[in-house]
Amino acid sequence: MAKTKEHINLAFIGHVDHGKSTLVGHLLLKAGAIAEQQLDDGENKFRFVMDKLGEERERGVTIDLAHQKFSTKKYDYTVVDCPGHRDFVKNMITGASQADAGVLVVAADDGVMPQTKEHVFLSKTLGINQLIVAINKIDLVDYDEAKFNELKDEVSALIKTVGFNPADVPFIPVSAFEGDNIKDASPNTSWYKGDTLMQALDNLAAPEKPVSLPLRIPIQDVYSITGVGTVPVGRVETGVMKKGENVIFEPAGASGEVKSIEMHHETFETAEPGDNIGFNVRGVGKNDIRRGDVAGHVDDAPAVAKEFDAQIVVLQHPGVITVGYTPVFHCHTSQVACTFLELTAKLDPATGQVAEENPDFLKTGNAAFVKVKPTKPMVIENAKKIPQMGRFAIRDMGQTVAAGLCIDVTPAK
């Protein structure tokens, strides 16, 4: 079967109890991607679709990223249902960096929460340039237009601060549970004349596929499949991989010929950016590669950094960041502790101009140029050359302390 429609990866972001999973579940139902009988009865029937993992069902929280597909007349979508609880922000980071567009879910009865702000900021830093805002649970505020407008103003102000133009962002009153304005216009919001959620999704611009950039596939998992062998799984970020080509995994160093490529249980001869694939490489075993490795062509291998220069924004740090600080950097699918070697310059966050050379410390709200050294080999690349491989978030003490972009790499070899 040929791949015909263009494909969009969609991240659902927002505060934990604002109804992301329920909205995704109802969207999948309306789009015909799941049957009614797959749903539980009662309050949480739509969320169940996304929360397949047993542990999640017990806790009632979405933990891992659930890749779900649905289609409209225009596009094929893969939903990256991004977890909302604070300790899962790092999942969101690896999730959001895989998304072409974001749906920000804000509950009408609860409004903008601190986490809402953090998710908006991170998604912009991690490369989401298209946004749809779903004002959810509109049924709980009696479909009140004034309440919707109040929230629209509040969220507009928030997204403007990180560089979205509110005029380009659809704001949609929805009820994830009742189904208002998901597929069809709801009679309960006769005051609303804009698109439904599915119409707004079809108005997104398909991402231009970075096919001319070098091949990069960050590995999410490695499986052993009977009759096939070792199957690394990941999303093609850039470039094109064809069956029969030789690829190398860095920093592991393992290489071999691509024997097969599979996506959603179908085999393909090639894989392009945006494709979530499993593939098999001759001579590469399960113990040779792991999550966080990156596959590329042998003649243009992913860069392993000895150290790198970066531009960061400190989002929230209870103290100060100084030389020697060693938090965990989350870049594509890798998580590696990196040490701050030098604080090169503090920047004016409004203009990006240097405000102070070699500052003694950085604190919440500061933007800066820094030099860091990974404590073990990791792939990270200049964000100007390969943006998908140059974005990262910095985590410490169970929270995201900073986010940034790699601007130069000193290669390890």
Curated annotation (Swiss-Prot):
Question: Which positions in this protein are listed as binding Mg(2+)?
Answer: S21
**Top-rank lineage group of the source organism:** Archaea
Spell out the residue ranges making up region: G5.
175-177
Catalytic activity entry: GTP + H2O = GDP + phosphate + H(+)
- Could you tell me one molecular function GO term of this UniProt entry? GTP binding
Q: Which keywords appear in this protein's UniProt record, sorted alphabetically?
A: Cytoplasm, Elongation factor, GTP-binding, Hydrolase, Magnesium, Metal-binding, Nucleotide-binding, Protein biosynthesis
Q: What is its EC number?
A: 3.6.5.3
Subcellular localization(s) per the UniProt record? Cytoplasm
A GO cellular-component term linked to this record? cytoplasm
Question: Residue ranges of region G1?
Answer: 14-21
Q: Please list where the region (G3) is annotated.
A: 81-84
Show where the tr-type G domain sits: 5-211
Q: Quick one: which residues bind GTP?
A: 14-21, 81-85, 136-139
Chain spans, region G4: 136-139
Residue numbers spanned by region G2 = 60-64
Top-level EC class: hydrolase
Instruction: Please give the family membership noted in the entry.
Output: Belongs to the TRAFAC class translation factor GTPase superfamily. Classic translation factor GTPase family. EF-Tu/EF-1A subfamily.
Task of the protein: GTP hydrolase that promotes the GTP-dependent binding of aminoacyl-tRNA to the A-site of ribosomes during protein biosynthesis.
Could you identify this protein by its name? Elongation factor 1-alpha
Q: Can you name the source organism?
A: Methanobrevibacter smithii (strain ATCC 35061 / DSM 861 / OCM 144 / PS)
In the UniProt record, the gene name given for this protein reads tuf
